Amino acid sequence: MIDPLSVFLLLLSASTPIVFAALGELVTERAGVLNLGVEGMMIVGALAGFAAAHATGSPFIGFVVAALAGAAVSMTFAMLTQFLLANQVASGLALTLFGLGLAALFGKPLEGIKAPAMVPGPLRINWIVWLGIAMVPLIWWFLNRSRAGLILRGVGENHDAAHALGYPVRIVRITAIGFGGAMAGVGGAFLSIAIVLQWTEGMTAGAGWIALAIVVFSNWTALGVLAGAWLFGGVTVLQLRLQAAGVAVPVQFLSMAPYLATIIVLVLISAQQKYSRRSGRAAPGSLGQNFYALR
Amino acid sequence: MNRRKLMASLAVIPAIGLATPVFAQEEPLKVGFIYVGPVGDGGWTYQHDLGRQAIEEEFGDRVETTFIESVPEGADAERALSQLALAGNELIFATSFGFMDPVINVAAKFPDVKFEHATGYKRAENVATYDARFYEGRAVMGTIAGRMTESNKIGYIGSFPIPEVIQGINSSFIHARKVNPDVEMKVVWAYSWFDPAKEADAASALIAEGVDVILQHTDSTAPLAKAQEAGAIGFGQASDMSNFAPSPRVSSIIDNWAPYYIERVGQVLDGTWESKGTWAGIAGGEVEIGEITEAVPAEVKEEALALKDSIASGEYHPFTGPLNRQDGSEWLAEGQVATDEELSGMNFFVEGITAKIPE
């Protein structure tokens, strides 16, 4: 029999990269910016974090450097979309390709090196996992209960109105993009430092795209992000455990289960939205639109 | 670097068309590769790229090689193959099973280009196939696994349920059981050749089931890293993965494609290339057994090496009867040896494995 606690503990760590990346993207999108470069920022974070952890022997410094690196590459996106008013979808895709290539180039000397050991936190779970979970109420509080969060949401809902009220739309958005980059960087670094325990080219293998999907899945709420990441990570871990335990469920079904579960919930959410429209719970009004001050 | 090279070679095409060949300078033979993973995977693709580098070393200015890495199996592979063919490559190596139909389709459109497809079984006038008898190496790994396990549970991370992988699982299991009748095998399918996070999760799932020896047929070193964390052992896959020696990596199966690649490029250069299927193993040097480390007791090492030698000399075949299929029906009678046709279409587990093959 499969012990549910061990599945849960595995799920906690398997979903952490997505929790971080999706929470970061949530804040970015709430500010009205659609950054499709999550995958690119994650892999840059994975490489930078791993390199720093290896060089200093301290995983903690690795995560700090990963956050800085993620934020730094996200600034290229900020530059393109906020100052040069480039299309956000195209710039985001470019950031993904750029990040993957950049990391592959600089990652060559680090191939095959092992990550330094981490000191586990409570329940023999990595501290970063707990940090990821702690970020959920923090971000909820920030978005829904703080003045700064209200301004950020205002910028995301209607940037013209926010501008007319005198809020610095561009600065708010650049900050949000930077935060999203830092979070994606930490998520990526968790992958290289804590899960895979080494640097491998292309190691994010689509995690950034899943994070993007989870933001939509979450209906742009912090708690929804956690639920989505756990659902996706949980089903992934569970299907591997079921396979290892030799449970007679067709493997194809198990493999598609995480995606299937995500799609079903998305359908349920959109159905629910259709019949009970509640304000402030759908996509931000200005999502993906560039802002420039006419006067 | 590869993309840039490719662009450069695309740009050169019209120039070649216009220039009149006044000087009889011989154009180098262009050889293209598509890889399923990144060259830095440290496993399967890395070894193919070593083969490509060996070609450059061997033939120098007479060849020019290009590669496209991380090509998904499926429709995108056709695009990549066409791109290479249009760029003037005369010989193209497609190095993953899932490139099979794309290769056949593109080869029909470019009858003058020669294609080489790894691990597949569909051939054409201008499509040859090549493969290595990995199951011979798996027999050696299985022997070590059977001797080394303390929990009597060994785990296998499979990529896709295709004959090549199934041969490996069967061969490992048969030889583990031979030296340890109590051994059980757990199989997890990752449905990917290269996904480090998923491979790591699969290894964790196996370890949570009590497995202490992990075999893998996926390309990254992530399962070894996980094994190390949990105090389990594993084997290098496709490449030596010696960074993880002496433990958790206690030995490895190394794919050495260089001799085959050099031979085939040489045949194109002197005009003797023809379509055929090649399937060499330990004896041909395509499958090598990486150093067995000191983590393995001397007598186990000796036993494993003896098995390797008997396979290399042709004295022993890893699939020798009596062997039954999983459902208990007889497959090979006493002393009977599996034919290559049977092996290349293998779609069943042998008796004793409890996992089911996804259908």
Q: Predicted regions span which residues?
A:
Chain B
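N-terminal secretory signal peptides and thylakoid transit peptides that target proteins
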Residues: 1-11
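A residue-level marker of the well-folded mature domains of exported/periplasmic proteins
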Residues: 24-359
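N-terminal signal peptide c-region/cleavage motif recognized by signal peptidases
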Residues: 19-21
